[in-house]
UniProtKB/Swiss-Prot annotation:
PANTHER family: INSULIN-LIKE GROWTH FACTOR BINDING PROTEIN, INSULIN-LIKE GROWTH FACTOR-BINDING PROTEIN 6. This is Insulin-like growth factor-binding protein 6. The keyword Secreted applies. Residues 101-158, 215-237 are annotated as: Disordered. The lineage of its organism: Eukaryota, Metazoa, Chordata, Craniata, Vertebrata. The keyword Lipid biosynthesis does not apply. Residues 26-105 form the IGFBP N-terminal domain. One of its GO terms (molecular function) is insulin-like growth factor I binding. GO terms for cellular component: extracellular space. Keywords: Disulfide bond, Glycoprotein, Growth factor binding, Secreted, Signal.
Amino acid sequence: MTPHRLLPPLLLTLLLAARPGGALARCPGCGQGVSAGCPGGCAEEEDGGPAAEGCAEAGGCLRREGQQCGVYTPNCAPGLQCQPPEKEDLPLRALLQGRGRCGRARTPSGENPKESKPQAGTARSQDVNRRDQQRNSGTSTTPSRSNSGGVQDTEMGPCRKHLDSVLQQLQTEVFRGAHTLYVPNCDHRGFYRKRQCRSSQGQRRGPCWCVERMGQPLPGSSEGGDGSSLCPTGSSG
């Protein structure tokens, strides 16, 4: 073979060697059965390390059973849900920190999963989440006393009600790590903070927007951007 015919293969080899991570982005969860959820040019990563930048930009791969997951990670494969550690006192915080694991839905022994019976474990998890919210917001776990007019001294703000509904949804539905999950950002009084953001997508920040204390978008503010924009200063917690 003449020297000029060797030049194109040699250049191709050098270009592939110069790319970070080789010819394929190393993405977790690109195994058999879930390959349809992986972007093009994505190879399976056996060591379970962090996804490469190219993989995060493509949206990431579906997480397999036993892999780490959370609110800000790629979804678990179909049929799996992102579950916090079994004896975790703050399950929501564990999911926000990415300390969950993809696994099959936990069903108590001897119970038909199709039957909608109340479960003691679910009630306990809801109580734990409620205590976690109250601890973070600085409110007391004791019920508020009613005044002479029959109205509680401390009423739940609109943002706090919204947050409770999100927590209830996470308890009752199969949680697969939705990329567009919105957890409202509340102040200690239960009202909305000015800056609200959706969950991140891989290594990219989720879209943000500005609202007033009751949750209504401020004039000129719309959902979008990379999450780096700031809201005007002022009242509303």
